[in-house]
């Protein structure tokens, strides 16, 4: 919490000299971190480890050329999965002409212009503009501009993209049907809800991304669906036409995987988008795709084109300095910038794709050029550049109408995600089949596969360490009270060289030789430190020094330092982790495993009684880590338990609580969590071990009905397992804080201490 640094400073000032003696704990080596801030160093080291893994990822990637014959099909299915292209399209309906352009006919030399719409998913359409040649050649081009380019600008109806407009008009004049698809842009006017009167400065693409990512969808994937829905409609009309796809900037980010997934697209051209993706974490968050760098990268995606054409232009893409500036009532957007890619790196990525493509594609036409002018003819053949302006039969306010179209398309995406959220409970139950498992009598065994899926597919597994720690834990004494002694302890993390686990260890005095006591691992929250929970000299805000209080009662306590500290310095860790299939909790889980292994070596510790108790972000840890690490014999979630998926995706949250759609905590979303594990399902992975929720009525993290709704599903499963006493919830009149009443009784009951 915010007062953590001040609290620790007061501790140093007020404590007698003997508390600050540097004596290490028996069985450990002396403290080596000196006066450096361990939490800041931890975050820094994790960042270094992630950048190393990102750099190594392309070299460890597998490609279709090195796998079995049907690997293209498997890889396409996997690419569709991580991009959220998983909903069956309607498969019916034509491209239809709609107003406003239909009511104000626009004619040009050799072609006419129409506003068009086509079906994609139920209650979700694609829209754009069509340049219809008067003498068609049988060629069709689908064009995606950069996110901030209106289709009207791309064809020259309004200023802004004159060079591109000249090329597209020339293409239409030469007989090619040109469809310019409307994209979700980077403004923020519609990023929020007029119903509840809350808004953010998140770009529209980020606003859609946040809610969609949690439900296993993606703004990129939705736009791929719109492209492929258009292809569906065109092919129904004429199976023999040749369809090409071109994308500029953000449009290129969509065009490459769209073409990779659909063989009906004969050729794809990309401008200002094709690049290495190892630094995607520094770009806008709506480009974040789970495991994309590990499994694909742009080179790997290009290989899925097989023997179809690819044209890459290294013309500079969009330059974006960040999200819209925060202003009153609008804040919370994630940082991220876009700029030109180095030509040598783009060319190297192109050459990697050339090298890795399947043998049958060796003769496919793949072209790289420095600018659009160099490669445009390679893509479309000789075409004129038509700079004359089309004429309109009546004036139209095209910009205002274009923005209304944009908001309509964006609202459809948001509505689709809200529908997925409403259906998510049924989806998760179908996968988990909790009631049937409860009746099977093999709960622990049957849930092991789900536990592995949670670790590997949702949290991200760092894997097994390459060896045991080569160094012992290091420590220094920081507390010496009448009831207990405290040390800061640091230990290596073998699975991530250079990264360490660290915390405060409290050992009660008076433990008899041969006596073994339970341990309670007490976890701080956001921007917190172990001293917030373990400080014996003052009653800390929110935490009420609950770790120190437990130590006074005779429990052995360990208070870990978790790496969610430093604002964007830690949030960017999630950005670096996701592209290689990891998350912040990948490291937290590994750190807790090391801590537990160390605790089990201590002669005073009963390794069968290792409990977890965390507040706020520590409550998030209480849901995730014990679900994976079965060495924890019980878990208590305080000031965090929720209908977690709704808290992340609700555009119009009910009740007065904090929804992550409207905060700067952009690291909260976890890919496809909404279809796999809400808090009930996480608690089911903890079962049959004891599990408890501590909930203050005034805690703004949620509202009581939401908390009770989600908890009821847990209580039902424990009841069906015939262990209803193993789970409890305590509501109390208070806020975001540790109460330490029912929870302390819960610890005493299940740890059987004090006797």
Model-derived features: positions:
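Alpha/beta-hydrolase-fold catalytic nucleophile elbow
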Residues: 182, 271-272, 313, 561, ...
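Cleavable N-terminal signal peptides
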Residues: 9, 19-20
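Primarily recognizes the serine-hydrolase "nucleophile elbow" in alpha/beta-hydrolase
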Residues: 229-304, 597-665, 671-672
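Alpha/beta-hydrolase-fold serine-hydrolase catalytic core, especially in secreted/extracellular enzymes
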Residues: 22-126, 136, 207-223, 228-232, ...
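Bacterial N-terminal signal peptides that target proteins for export
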Residues: 1-8
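Loop/turn elements at helix/coil->beta-strand transitions in domains of secreted/extracellular proteins
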Residues: 138-139, 174-177, 240-242, 263-267, ...
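Cap/lid segment of the alpha/beta-hydrolase catalytic domain
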Residues: 138-235, 273-286, 512-601, 648-656
């Amino acid at each position: 919490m915010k007062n953590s640094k001040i609290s620790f400073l007061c501790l140093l000032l007020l404590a007698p000299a003997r508390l600050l003696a540097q004596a290490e704990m028996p069985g450990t080596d002396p403290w080596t971190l000196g006066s450096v801030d361990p939490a800041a160093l931890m975050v820094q080291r994790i960042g270094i480890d992630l950048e190393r893994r990102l750099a190594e990822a392309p070299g460890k990637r597998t490609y279709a050329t090195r796998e079995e014959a049907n690997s293209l099909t498997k890889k396409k299915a996997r690419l569709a999965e991580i991009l959220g292209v998983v909903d069956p399209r309607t498969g019916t309906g034509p491209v239809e002409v709609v107003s406003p352009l239909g009511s104000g006919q626009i004619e040009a030399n050799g072609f006419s212009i129409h506003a068009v719409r086509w079906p994609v998913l139920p209650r979700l359409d694609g829209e754009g503009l069509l340049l219809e040649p008067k003498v068609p050649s049988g060629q069709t081009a689908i064009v995606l501009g950069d996110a901030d380019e209106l289709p009207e600008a791309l064809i020259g109806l309004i200023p802004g993209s004159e060079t591109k407009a000249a090329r597209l008009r020339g293409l239409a004049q030469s007989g090619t049907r040109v469809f310019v698809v409307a994209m979700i842009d980077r403004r923020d006017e519609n990023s929020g809800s007029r119903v509840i009167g809350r808004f953010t400065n998140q770009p529209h693409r980020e606003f859609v991304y946040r809610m969609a990512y949690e439900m296993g969808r993606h703004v990129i994937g939705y736009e791929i669906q719109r492209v492929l829905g258009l292809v569906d409609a065109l092919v129904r009309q004429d199976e023999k036409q040749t369809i090409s796809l071109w994308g500029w900037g953000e449009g290129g980010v969509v065009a490459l995987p769209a073409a990779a997934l659909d063989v009906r697209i004969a050729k794809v051209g990309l401008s200002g988008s094709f690049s290495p993706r190892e630094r995607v974490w520094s770009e806008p968050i709506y480009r974040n795709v789970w495991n994309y760098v590990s499994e694909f990268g742009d080179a790997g995606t290009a290989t899925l084109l097989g023997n179809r054409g690819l044209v890459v232009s290294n013309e500079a893409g969009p330059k974006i300095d960040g999200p819209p500036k925060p202003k009153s009532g609008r804040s919370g957007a994630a940082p991220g910038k876009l700029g030109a890619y180095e030509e040598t790196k783009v060319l190297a990525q192109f050459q990697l794709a050339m090298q890795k493509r399947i043998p049958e594609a060796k003769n496919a036409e793949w072209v790289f050029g420095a600018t659009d002018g160099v490669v445009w003819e390679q893509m479309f053949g000789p075409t004129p550049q038509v700079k004359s302006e089309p004429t309109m039969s009546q004036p139209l306010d095209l910009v205002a109408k274009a923005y209304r179209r944009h908001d309509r398309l964006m609202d459809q995406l948001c509505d689709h995600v809200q529908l997925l959220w409403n259906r998510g409970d049924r989806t998760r139950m179908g996968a988990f089949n909790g009631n049937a498992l409860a009746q099977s009598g093999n709960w622990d065994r049957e849930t092991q596969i789900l536990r592995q899926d949670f670790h590997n597919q949702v949290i991200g597994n760092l894997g097994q360490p390459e060896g045991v720690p080569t160094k012992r834990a290091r420590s220094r004494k920081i507390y010496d009270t009448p009831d207990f002694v405290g040390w800061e302890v640091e230990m290596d993390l073998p699975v991530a060289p250079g990264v360490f686990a660290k915390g405060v260890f409290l050992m009660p005095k008076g433990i008899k030789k041969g006596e073994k006591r339970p341990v309670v691992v007490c976890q701080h929250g956001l921007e917190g430190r172990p001293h917030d929970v373990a400080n014996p000299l003052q009653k800390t805000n929110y935490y009420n020094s609950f770790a120190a209080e437990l130590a006074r009662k005779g429990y052995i306590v360990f208070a870990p330092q978790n790496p969610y500290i430093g604002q964007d310095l830690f949030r960017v860790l999630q950005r670096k982790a996701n592209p290689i299939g990891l998350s912040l909790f990948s490291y937290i889980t590994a750190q807790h495993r090391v801590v537990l292994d160390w605790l089990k070596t201590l002669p005073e510790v009963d390794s069968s009684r290792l409990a977890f108790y965390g507040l706020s972000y520590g409550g998030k840890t209480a849901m995730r880590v014990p679900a994976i690490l079965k060495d924890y014999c019980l878990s208590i979630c305080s000031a965090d338990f929720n209908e977690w998926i709704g808290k992340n995706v609700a555009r119009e949250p009910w009740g007065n609580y904090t929804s992550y759609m409207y905060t700067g905590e952009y690291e909260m979303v976890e890919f496809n969590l909404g279809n796999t594990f809400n808090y009930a399902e996480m608690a089911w992975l903890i079962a049959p071990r004891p599990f408890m929720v501590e909930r203050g009525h005034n805690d703004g993290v949620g509202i009581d009905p939401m908390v009770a709704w989600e908890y009821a599903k847990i209580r039902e499963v424990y009841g069906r397992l015939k262990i209803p006493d193993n789970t409890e919830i305590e509501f109390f009149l208070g806020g975001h804080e540790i109460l330490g009443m029912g929870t302390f009784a819960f610890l005493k009951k299940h740890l059987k201490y004090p006797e």
